[in-house]
Design a protein with these regions (language model features):
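Intrinsically disordered, low-complexity cationic segments
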Residues: 1-5, 21
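A general marker of short, structured functional hotspots
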Residues: 5-6, 27, 111, 123
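Short, positively charged and aromatic/hydrophobic N-terminal segments
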Residues: 3, 9-12
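Intrinsic disorder/low-complexity signature
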Residues: 4-6, 38, 132
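Divalent metal-dependent catalytic cores for phosphoryl transfer on phosphate-bearing substrates
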Residues: 57-137
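Acidic/His-rich, divalent-metal-binding segments that scaffold phosphate/diphosphate chemistry
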Residues: 12-81
Length: 137
């Protein structure tokens, strides 16, 4: 996997600097404790791929960035239900309310829950479809 330096997202779709700062300091470091396949390089790759895919759709860059950043955070509670736990972690982060409405957060939770490749259903939103596809790259 390629290594992406912090804040290096190579597309025209850019999330807000304040949101990036929060995620870079509070969320991405959590991936350091996960297995090598789900470490910081992985999450940075998924973020970059998600932003690249998202530029083809009418979607919110901040939402895509956050969904991609949180998609595997639930691994801290175990692999089997990590997609559900990741959604819970996203909703529990009260800082996100600075950038997102309750409705946006619900869409983001659904997208995080739906990213899993082994899921028996298709992602419910375009956000879930984008991050699920980026996670497979």
């Amino acid at each position: 996997m390629p290594h992406f330096p912090p804040n290096a997202y190579f597309c025209t779709m850019q999330p807000s600097e304040e949101l990036k700062n929060h995620i870079e300091t509070e969320i991405i470091p959590r991936y350091e404790s996960f297995d090598a396949a789900h470490g910081t390089d992985h999450v940075r790759t998924v973020i970059a791929q998600s932003l690249d895919l998202a530029r083809h759709y009418d979607v919110d860059a901040d939402m895509i960035y956050a969904v991609a950043a949180y998609h595997d955070t639930g691994l801290a509670r175990g692999r089997e239900l990590h997609h559900i736990h990741s959604g819970e972690i996203l909703l529990a982060d009260t800082e996100l309310r600075r950038w997102f409405t309750a409705e946006q957060l619900a869409v983001m939770r659904d997208a995080v829950e739906d990213h899993r490749a082994s899921s028996d259903h298709a992602p419910r939103t375009i956000y879930g479809r984008i991050v699920a596809e980026a996670d497979r790259c």
